[in-house]
Amino acid sequence: MQSQRIPGRKRGRPSLHSTPMKMAVHNLYSASAGSLPAVKIPKKRGRKPGYKIKSRVLMTPLALSPPRSTPEPDLSSIPQDAATVPSLAAPQALTVCLYINKQANAGPYLERKKVQQLPEHFGPERPSAVLQQAVQACIDCAHQQKLVFSLVKQGYGGEMVSVSASFDGKQHLRSLPVVNSIGYVLRFLAKLCRSLLCDDLFSHQPFPRGCSASEKVQEKEEGRMESVKTVTTEEYLVNPVGMNRYSVDTSASTFNHRGSLHPSSSLYCKRQNSGDSHLGGGPAATAGGPRTSPMSSGGPSAPGLRPPASSPKRNTTSLEGNRCASSPSQDAQDARRPRSRNPSAWTVEDVVWFVKDADPQALGPHVELFRKHEIDGNALLLLKSDMVMKYLGLKLGPALKLCYHIDKLKQAKF
C-alpha cells in the first residue's frame, strides 16, 4: 500500500523540498491518523503563491493612501488655522462706508434738493454694493438722467452690478466695472464727480459739521459774483447810451463841421430822432453845461444846428453824409482784402495785401516785387526761401518770415 501511495504522490504536484524532506513527508504519511493535522500545515503554507502575497503588499498602500490623504488637511488645519481663516474671512471683512457731503456744490447736472434728500452715508457694505448705490443716487438726482447715464463707464465680467436710468420712454441698464478694492471705488466716484462738476460729493471719511458754514460763505460769495456779473452785463448793455450822452460835449463842437461829425454822436442823434420829448430844448442842455446855454436860451448858434425835434430830416441826411465821409478808408481796406479765404484763388493784389498785412515792417517794403513778378495765390504757395532770396532779392530774415507765414497759410483750414 505504501508503494502505491508514493507513485501516486509523484503524479501530483511536485514538491518544493529536497529529498530528505521527501523522506520526512513519507514518514509522516506512514504515521498514525492522529498526526494528520500536522501534515496539513505545510500544505497550506505551500499552496499560498508568492505573487498573491506581493499583490496584497502592493494593494495595501493603495488602499491606505486615500485615508492618509484625507486626514492631512485635518492635521494641517491646526497650525494653518490662523493663516487660512483670515484669507477666507478677508472678502467678508472688506466693507466700505461712503459719506455724502450734502453741503457740496451740486453742479449743473445734479438737483440740489434731491441731493439733500440722500442718506448720510452708504454702507458699510461690500464695495460693489456701495458703488452701485452711489452711482444710482447720482442718476436719480440728475436733472436729465440721460446725461449722467452716458458718463457712467461700462463694465464687463466679474460680479455684475448694474444701474438703471429712464429716458426716451425706456428703462436702460448698464453694468458697472468689477470692484477690486476700496481705492477703486473712490477713484471711480472721483472721476464721475469731476465730470459732473460736483467735487467733494463723496468721501470715505465723515464730513465735519463746520463745513456748512463755509459752504454758506461760498454761496454768499457766489451770489455776490453773480450780482457783479449781472451788473457788468447791464453796464455793458447800457454803457453805449451813457457814453453817447457824455460824448455830446466833444461832439457839440463838431456840429459846426458836418463833415467831421464824431461817430458816437450819430447814435445820440438817433436817440433824439426816436422821440425823446424831454430833450426838445436842446440835447446838450442836460449834459453840456454852459456850452449849451446859448442854444437853450435862443442865442446865436452855429449854422446848420437845429433842434432834433424841429428838423429830423436834416439830422438824418447829415448823419448819412458823415458816415459816407468817415467810411471810405474802411471800405477801401475791406475792398483790398481777398474775397476768398482759399489762397489758391487769390489774385496778385490779394497776395500783395497778404504780404503787407503779415509783417508790415519786414515785408512791407517788398510788396512791389510781388506785383512786378505777378505772383498770385498759387505761386505764393509754391515759394520757398531759396527762391525768394534768389529771384526776389530778399535777405534771409525777411525770406524766412515770409516762408513762415506761407506755412501757416497752408496749415489753415479754408
Curated annotation (Swiss-Prot):
Location of Phosphoserine modifications: S55, S65
Keyword Lipoprotein found: no
GO annotation, cellular component aspect: nucleus
Chief localization: nucleus
Polar residues bias (residue ranges): 257-276, 312-332
Keyword Chloroplast: no
GO biological process, alphabetically ordered: negative regulation of DNA-templated transcription
Gene field: SCML4
Protein name: Sex comb on midleg-like protein 4
Annotated region (Disordered), positions in chain: 257-343
Domain SAM residues, every copy: 288-354
Family classification: Belongs to the SCM family.
Location in the cell: Nucleus
MF terms in GO: chromatin binding; histone binding
Function as written in the Swiss-Prot or TrEMBL entry: Putative Polycomb group (PcG) protein. PcG proteins act by forming multiprotein complexes, which are required to maintain the transcriptionally repressive state of homeotic genes throughout development.
SUPFAM superfamilies assigned: SAM/Pointed domain
SMART domains in the record: SAM (SM00454)
Feature: compositional bias, Low complexity: 284-304
Keywords: Nucleus, Phosphoprotein, Repressor, Transcription, Transcription regulation
